[in-house]
Amino acid sequence: MKTELTLNVLQTMNAQEYEDIRAAGSDERRELTHAVMRELDAPDNWTMNGEYGSEFGGFFPVQVRFTPAHERFHLALCSPGDVSQVWVLVLVNAGGEPFAVVQVQRRFASEAVSHSLALAASLDTQGYSVNDIIHISMAEGGQV
């Protein structure tokens, strides 16, 4: 019997369990990615894109990218797996730099991710630079 990927299940899974689902095939990985995406709130006028193959490099079992309409930067939520034992939220400038981990989570905390996304969207709308958004997000988001 297949386990339903609820928020509670996502919060209790370890890195190996995320890797096991990725290894089970593309359908399973898609279901996992969609389960994570269902728990997140993308800011208005931002796109939310999940990785299903290796579009974003294929380093994580789950990677969801959030991008404002102007596409000058994006925030990427990356799950635990072989590369990292924790969840990380990374801000990447469109040119690749600056690049910063703005949030680290020992367990999936969708409300903290959604808060960080809303904060970045608000700062962006107010005209803050990408560097400022990184520093403020790091100070606000930090470790969860």
From Swiss-Prot:
InterPro entries: Plasmid_inh_PsiB, PsiB-like_sf. Pfam families: PsiB. Keywords: Plasmid. It comes from the Bacteria. The keyword Repressor does not apply. The keyword Plastid does not apply. In contrast to PsiB protein of plasmid R6-5, this protein is unable to prevent SOS induction for potentially two reasons: less activity and/or insufficient expression. To PsiB protein of plasmid R6-5. This is Protein PsiB. It comes from Escherichia coli (strain K12). The gene is psiB.
